Amino acid sequence: MTSPDTGGDREKVVTKLTSALRQDLKVRAALHGLDMQDAVEAGITAWRGLGSNPAAVDTSGAETYSTFLPAGLWDDFREDCKNRGVSLTQGIAQAVSIWLDINPVPEVKRPAMVRRIVVCNQKGGVGKTAITAGLGEALAEDPAALVPVRVSKHFAALLEEDDRPEDPLALEDLPGLGQRVLLVDFDPQGHLTRQLGHELLPMGGDSLTNHMAGDGKGELSDLIVTVDESRFGDRLHLLPACTDAFLLDVRIASVRAREAALERALRSVEGDYDVVLIDCPPSLGISMDAALYFGRRRDNEDAGNSGALIVVQAEDSSADAYGLLTSQIEDMRSDLALDMDYLGLVVNHYDARRGFIATSSLQAWMDIKDPRVVGVVGDLKEQKEAVRAKRPLLAYAPRCEQSIAIRALAREISK
């Protein structure tokens, strides 16, 4: 059945397609940056060019499916199906299958140099751990699946007029980013480790602290565990915390080039990943210097590939803490002649219902411009529930507002 498309050059066609083929078509077309109708057109064209019928495709359970094709193509395809002795349902199934075969899942683009993202703020309670975990999850999601992404409405509403999306509330289904991610729990309190359902490393055993102090008892890679959720495959790993990190500053105070202690410790494993995320403690001590040094811009590294991602809240005390942190970063830049990039500000736990303090503070963060706000994440129940369940947020509630906002953040800092 056909009916003219309002554009005049395409017509609507209605056929049948199994739900599995329809889903594969939707995902694969998105992965290749195509509209589904263009993929169907290409599949039909390829099918018509074959010298003989391909293998039959299982069409049991096929349901009504409509798309738009160039005027006349469907009639020609119908005639070809008749001449080849196959039904339209079988013909379109074969055409879609052919297109899927000749357009495999594209390989994930890997960064030229491992990205090192230092998630920081010396103020506790701003949600650094939740942002670290969520960002790592968003970066590691399945590249062969579509996930919902939307710019936070509070963020979008404050963008410059020229940058504002047509509908900031509209969801867009995009492929997962498929990055290989290492989360490093650099906070001796171990919140990141526990939130993801793992145990802290035992005192007296091996730990990141030992490796930073030059006293490692084995391979650092032996301490790394997998965050075992199907949507992340084997792409999301965790280096758990150990409470011996409370003594880290003392342990590395006399170490040669102590600011490079974290970099030396992670050197043996960083090459296995596309992104390394450091969940920093609420501290401005030597350990924070080591984290910032790890996130500096290395020789021949593009600006903005690595750096500091600062988590704040829409309230006054966050502004005071932000000033202390940026002073430390600027001191390191000056004292060690480092190139240290700011990846941006994340305003976390935002709730406009808290009134003028929240909304005016958000506006103040937006007005800074350098570093700019790269994400606004709401204060909603799903994150707390995920922590209670000891599961990653994006696996526990993949379509909740927080998950969607964090995916937008991951894409914003991956540009």
Where are the predicted features?
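N-terminus-biased targeting/localization segments
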Residues: T18, D24, G33-D35, G43, ...
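Hydrophobic loop/turn residues within beta-sheet-rich immunoglobulin-like superfamily modules
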Residues: T18, L69-P70
